C-alpha cells in the first residue's frame, strides 16, 4: 500500500506512536488509509452541512475495511463575495485549495482520497488536486439547495440579485425586497439553479469521477447521505483495484462533460475550470474543443437562470444520466469509458431514465440545436471570448456604442444611477485574471441590467467573468485581457461594438490606423497589490487557457 511509507517497518515506530496518540489502533493502521478532504465551514450555505456528509463517507470507508483520515481546506461563497474586494480572491482560491489538498495527500501517502465540496471554486480546486495526485479518488458533494417560494412563485438567489435592480427602477419596494431575502434561500446546499456550483457538480458525474446521482440529489434528501456512504465504500474498492484518477479523467471523459455542459446550458465558468482540471490530468483541452462539441450538441434543458426549472426538477426528471442517455442517442457520449462506479458509462446508461420531457427535452425537440455556450472571436477578442447563449433570448446580432468602465464598481454605479441606455454596450475591463486581479464575476451589474428590464436591450462585455446566475447578452473572458494590452484596453466611449452570434464574432468597429495610434499611447494600469493577489497576478495565465498558474 502507498501508506506503508508512513506506517510499516521498525523505522516507522515513531510515526505509529503519533497515530496512536490520536487513538488509532494497530488494526486500523493495517488497513488502507483513505484521506477525506472536507471543505466544511460556517461561511457557505453549500458547505454548512458537510460535516454530516463527511461522517457518512467515513462510515462507508470503515464498512468497507478502510481507515478514514479527515482534514479540511478552505472555501469561499461567491454570492457573499460578489461586488466587492472579496471577489478578487474567489478564483485565486481554486489554486490554493488544489495545493492544500496536494500537500496533505503527499505527506500522508494516502492509499486513496475522497474530496467533499459543493460550491463554485472549491469543486474545481478539489478536482485539480486529485488529477494532480493521480491516486484512487472520488468526489462527493453536499447537493443543491431547494428553491424558495415567495408570493406563490419559486425563487432563488438570482431572484434577489435581480430584485435589487427592480427596486432601483421603482418596480419593487424595499420592504418587498427585505421579505424576499427571507424566502429565496430556504436552507443548506449549493444555490438552487444551474449556476456554477451545480454545473460543476453535474460535470463531476458526467466525468465519471463521482457516483451516479451525485450531480443532482438535493442537499436535504436522505439520498445524499446514501451517496456519501456508498462513496466511502467505493473508494476502498478503487484502492484494491488501483484505479487512479487519471484512469477516469481521460480525454473522452472531458468531451462527455462538455457535451453535458452544453446540453444543460451550464455556467461559462466551466470553460475555465474544465481546462484547468484537464491541464492537471495531462489532457490537452482548448476553446476549440468547447466550440466543436457545442456545435453538435443540442440544448436539452433550461434551468434557472435561463428558465423556470431548478436542479431538483432535473433530479426528478432523471438526473445527469438522463441527460447523457438522451445525448447517447446522437452518439455524443463515449459509452465504453470507465467511471468510479467501476462500471462503464454504457452500463450505467442501461438503468438511466427520463421521466419529464419538459425538463430534459428529447433530442428531436431541443430548446436549441446547438449547445448553451458559444466561443466568440474577432477584433475585440482575438484569443476568444465566451457567452452563455442559452441565457440569451431573441438576439442574434447586437451593435451599439460602448460605455467604458475600468472596474465593476464604476459600471454598477452607472447602471443603478440610470446612465445606461437601451442599445448601449457596457464594457468592463481591467477585471481579468491578471488585471483584476482575480477575474471577478459581474453578477451585480448583469443582475441590475436584468432587474431594470434592460437585459434584451443592453449588452455587457468584459475581460472578467460571470456568475452562473447571469442571464442576458453578456460576453466574458475577453482575451487578451486589458492588463496584457488586449484590444479591449483600447476601447473608448462611443466606439461601436458588434456582437454577431450567427457568425460567432465580436468586433470593435474602429479602423486599424486609429487603433494603432491608441496602442502607441496606451499605458497599462498599475495597481498596488500585496499578499496573495500580488503573487497570483504575476503567475496567472489568460482566461483562454483556464487562468491556471505558470509553473
Swiss-Prot record:
Catalytic residues, chain numbering: 467 (proton acceptor)
GO BP, sorted A to Z: isoleucine biosynthetic process; L-valine biosynthetic process
Nucleotide-binding in keyword set: no
Cofactor names: [2Fe-2S] cluster; Mg(2+)
Cellular component terms (Gene Ontology): cytosol
N6-carboxylysine modified-residue sites: 121
Binding site for Mg(2+): 78, 120-121, 441
Enzyme class, spelled out: lyase
Keyword tRNA-binding among UniProt keywords: no
Span of the signal peptide: none
Gene Ontology molecular function terms on file: 2 iron, 2 sulfur cluster binding; dihydroxy-acid dehydratase activity; magnesium ion binding
Enzyme Commission designation: 4.2.1.9
Function: Functions in the biosynthesis of branched-chain amino acids. Catalyzes the dehydration of (2R,3R)-2,3-dihydroxy-3-methylpentanoate (2,3-dihydroxy-3-methylvalerate) into 2-oxo-3-methylpentanoate (2-oxo-3-methylvalerate) and of (2R)-2,3-dihydroxy-3-methylbutanoate (2,3-dihydroxyisovalerate) into 2-oxo-3-methylbutanoate (2-oxoisovalerate), the penultimate precursor to L-isoleucine and L-valine, respectively.
Protein name from the UniProt record: Dihydroxy-acid dehydratase
Amino acid at each position: 500500500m502507498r501508506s506503508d511509507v508512513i506506517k510499516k517497518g521498525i523505522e516507522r515506530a515513531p510515526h505509529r506512536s503519533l497515530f496512536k496518540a490520536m487513538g488509532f489502533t494497530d488494526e486500523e493502521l493495517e488497513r488502507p488509509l483513505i484521506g477525506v478532504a472536507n471543505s466544511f465551514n460556517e461561511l457557505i450555505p453549500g458547505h454548512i452541512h458537510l460535516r454530516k456528509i463527511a461522517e457518512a463517507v467515513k462510515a462507508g470507508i470503515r464498512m468497507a475495511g478502510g481507515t478514514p483520515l479527515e482534514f479540511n481546506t478552505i472555501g469561499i461563497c461567491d454570492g457573499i463575495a460578489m461586488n466587492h474586494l472579496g471577489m478578487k480572491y474567489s478564483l485565486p482560491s481554486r489554486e490554493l485549495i488544489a495545493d492544500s489538498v496536494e500537500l496533505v495527500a503527499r505527506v500522508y501517502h494516502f492509499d486513496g482520497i475522497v474530496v467533499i465540496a459543493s460550491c463554485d471554486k472549491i469543486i474545481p480546486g478539489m478536482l485539480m488536486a486529485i488529477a494532480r495526485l493521480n491516486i484512487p479518488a472520488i468526489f462527493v458533494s453536499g447537493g443543491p439547495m431547494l428553491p424558495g417560494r415567495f408570493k406563490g412563485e419559486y425563487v432563488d438567489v438570482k431572484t434577489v440579485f435581480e430584485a435589487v435592480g427592480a427596486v432601483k427602477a421603482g418596480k419593487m419596494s424595499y420592504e418587498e425586497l427585505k421579505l424576499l431575502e427571507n424566502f429565496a434561500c430556504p436552507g443548506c446546499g449549493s444555490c438552487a439553479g444551474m449556476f456554477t456550483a451545480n454545473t460543476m457538480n453535474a460535470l463531476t458525474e458526467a466525468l465519471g469521477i463521482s457516483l451516479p446521482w451525485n450531480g443532482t440529489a438535493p442537499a436535504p434528501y436522505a439520498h445524499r447521505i446514501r451517496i456519501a456512504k456508498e462513496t466511502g465504500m467505493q473508494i476502498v474498492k478503487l484502492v484494491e483495484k488501483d484505479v487512479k484518477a487519471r484512469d477516469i479523467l481521460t480525454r473522452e471523459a472531458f468531451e462527455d462533460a462538455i457535451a453535458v455542459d452544453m446540453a444543460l446550458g451550464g455556467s461559462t465558468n466551466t470553460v475555465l475550470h474544465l481546462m484547468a482540471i484537464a491541464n492537471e490530468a495531462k489532457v490537452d483541452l482548448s476553446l476549440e474543443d468547447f466550440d466543436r462539441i457545442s456545435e453538435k450538441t443540442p440544448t436539452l434543458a433550461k434551468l434557472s437562470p435561463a428558465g423556470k426549472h431548478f436542479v431538483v426538477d432535473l433530479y426528478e426528471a432523471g438526473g445527469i444520466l438522463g441527460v447523457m442517455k438522451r445525448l447517447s442517442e446522437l452518439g455524443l457520449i463515449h459509452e465504453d469509458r470507465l467511471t468510479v462506479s467501476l462500471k462503464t458509462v454504457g452500463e450505467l446508461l442501461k438503468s438511466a431514465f427520463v421521466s419529464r420531457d419538459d425538463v430534459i427535452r428529447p433530442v428531436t425537440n431541443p430548446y436549441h440545436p446547438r449547445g448553451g455556450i458559444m466561443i466568440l472571436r474577432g477584433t475585440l477578442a482575438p484569443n476568444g471570448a465566451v457567452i452563455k447563449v442559452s441565457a440569451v433570448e431573441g438576439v442574434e446580432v447586437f451593435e451599439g456604442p460602448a460605455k467604458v468602465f475600468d472596474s465593476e464598481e464604476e459600471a454598477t454605479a452607472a447602471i443603478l444611477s440610470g446612465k445606461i441606455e437601451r442599445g448601449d454596450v457596457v464594457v468592463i475591463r481591467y477585471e481579468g485574471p491578471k488585471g483584476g486581479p482575480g477575474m471577478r464575476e459581474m453578477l451585480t451589474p448583469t443582475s441590475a441590467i436584468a432587474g431594470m428590464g434592460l437585459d434584451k436591450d443592453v449588452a455587457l462585455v468584459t475581460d472578467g467573468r460571470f456568475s452562473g446566475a447571469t442571464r442576458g447578452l453578456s460576453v466574458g473572458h475577453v482575451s487578451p485581457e486589458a492588463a496584457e494590452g488586449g484590444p479591449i484596453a483600447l476601447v473608448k466611449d462611443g466606439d461601436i461594438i458588434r456582437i454577431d452570434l450567427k457568425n460567432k464574432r465580436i468586433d470593435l468597429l474602429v479602423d486599424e490606423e486609429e487603433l494603432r495610434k491608441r496602442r502607441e499611447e496606451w499605458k497599462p494600469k498599475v495597481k498596488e497589490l500585496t499578499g496573495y493577489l500580488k503573487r497570483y497576478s504575476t503567475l496567472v495565465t489568460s482566461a483562454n487557457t483556464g487562468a491556471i498558474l505558470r509553473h
